[in-house]
Amino acid sequence: MIALRLSKAKILQACVQKQERTIEDFERGIAELKTQLYSQEEIESQEHRPSPERRELLLRMEHELGFLNYEMAVLRQIEAEKPLDVVDLGAVVVTNQRTFFISTSLERVEIEGRTVIGISQKAPIYQVMKGKRAGESFDYGGVRFAILEVY
């Protein structure tokens, strides 16, 4: 199994890059929405005033951007070279079903043709695998996961 091990540094790098792209997309969307809102505010006509829905959308996007930046800070705290043997923040958890990276809720990243699922410490599946080691198992969503390796 060790020979097939994905590099935690590569997994972390892929997660950071995905998060950076997501943040850039949100920043671009927020900038475009602000441009639309503020250019419409300059128009005197009552019928061209920005809708409350657009303002609400802007607030939601700004809130989500704040959360994305928080998740990036979590990723930046992870030490790829730190060895782990229990499921905790920064661990790669290889199971008989999937490979997880305990980090942030990034969903899927592809590394060397393999899928790794990023999950946060708040995810329900993390709660059932937390503190477990290779050789242990857990049940989630009606599926039994056998932990093959933690690093």
Give the predicted meaning of each segment.
Residues 147-150:
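Conserved hydrophobic positions within beta-strands
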